[in-house]
Amino acid sequence: MSNINLLVFLRFLFIIISQILIFNNILIFGVSPNIYLIFLIIFPLNYNKSFMYLYMFIAGLILDLFSNTYGIITFSLLISSFLKIYFIKFSFGHFDASKVRKTADYIRETSLYQKITFLILMFFTHQLILYSVEAFSFEKFDWVVKKTVLSTIISIILSYIFILIFFNKNAR
């Protein structure tokens, strides 16, 4: 197994286990932070897309199993992984089609505004899909908006702290 494959797999295990054992048991203002989206955000851009979708599918299934959400997390993770490239283009103004640049390069070489825009787009979209499918009703629109906004804010703050604590400077 090459270094990049091993690194991706270890990050996968670490983030998923952290979500299951720690963050699923935390409630802040009635929402549980979803830090597992960090794995998608730091997933290497030069990695095979099929493997990215496979990792997201497996992560979603594992999280659904431990969260009793019946495929909702899997669905929202797969949609978010598909939209990641478009959010990079929107937030950073371009995307390297040759895949020479890494996600860390985009994050390191850009302004704070662009970084925050990218994180908000990723987390907000994921949370909106997650809670919309969970509610599956327009009658609960205010509940979906409240949960989406609170969960996005809390997840971004805790994810940033999580990255600062556990990942090196290259991953930021």
What is the meaning of each model-derived region?
Residues 1-172:
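Terminal, non-globular segments
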